[in-house]
Amino acid sequence: MRRTFAGLTLALSAMLAFSTAGPSPAIAQPDMEPTAAQALLDGPAKAWLVADMDTGRVLASRDPYASHAPASTIKVLLAMTVLDHLRPESFARANQSHTEVECSCVGLKPGQAYTTRQLLEAILMVSGNDAANMLADMLGGQPVALAAMNRKAALVGARGTRASSPSGLDGPGWESVTTPHDLAVIMRAALKYPLIAHIMRQQTAQFPGKTITNQNELLTRYPGDLGGKTGYTNLARKTYVGAAQRGNRRLVVVQMYGSGDLYGQAIKLLDWGFAQP
């Protein structure tokens, strides 16, 4: 059952799906009118979702199962896949092919050794596409890495997700897809990895030859922010997935196909979500 208002779906009892089979969960009839959430319609994201991290209850959403390109938010899925197969202290040396990529980049130097942890910090904090390429090679090459990422997506319940590049870069014939629902599921699963949760909260990290600074502005703008990942490509437009905690409650927010101030909308979504019973 579903009630919509100008494209807005309030799903006060809906649950995020975490199984790998079966239909998407039904959205229960809300027990309040959607007028309380009308202000959320003014946000710049075409599709979005805010949900309780611990119960999986979707508090509000617009087009939560609409498929969009994820851009760099797919790096959260890559991070989980990496930690399923590689130890944080394992290392490899960068080569020229890792750096031949459209940036954003952390600035890998061919011949320099990097640990798995350093590369995870690079993809989660500064969205390094070069680091994503290197991690894919450490997993056995891009075809192997992408197959592992897509298996991981299915395993955690993100059944509408397909990664076609480890970094989120896209183009004709290699478009990645996901949904707001799936990104919320992926983020919830990722924050169960202590190292991912720690990295996403770091303001800075030491990287060979430099200090890198986390690009997630909500770390400083929103009290209780637990971390987040931005993304942008021409196909995806602006994307964001993040989480925050207030008291004992944790929420996850997803925004897809956006323009303008996604951080401002994320703050409104989180504030509204924390105000709900």
Placement of each model-derived feature along the sequence:
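Active-site-adjacent loops and short helices of periplasmic peptidoglycan-processing enzymes
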Residues: A26-H181, R188-L191
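Hydrophobic alpha-helical segments, especially transmembrane helices
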Residues: R3-T4, V76, R246, R250
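Hydrophobic alpha-helical transmembrane segments of integral membrane proteins
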Residues: T4-A6, S72, G224
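Penicillin-recognizing serine hydrolase domain
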Residues: D31-K46, G141-P277
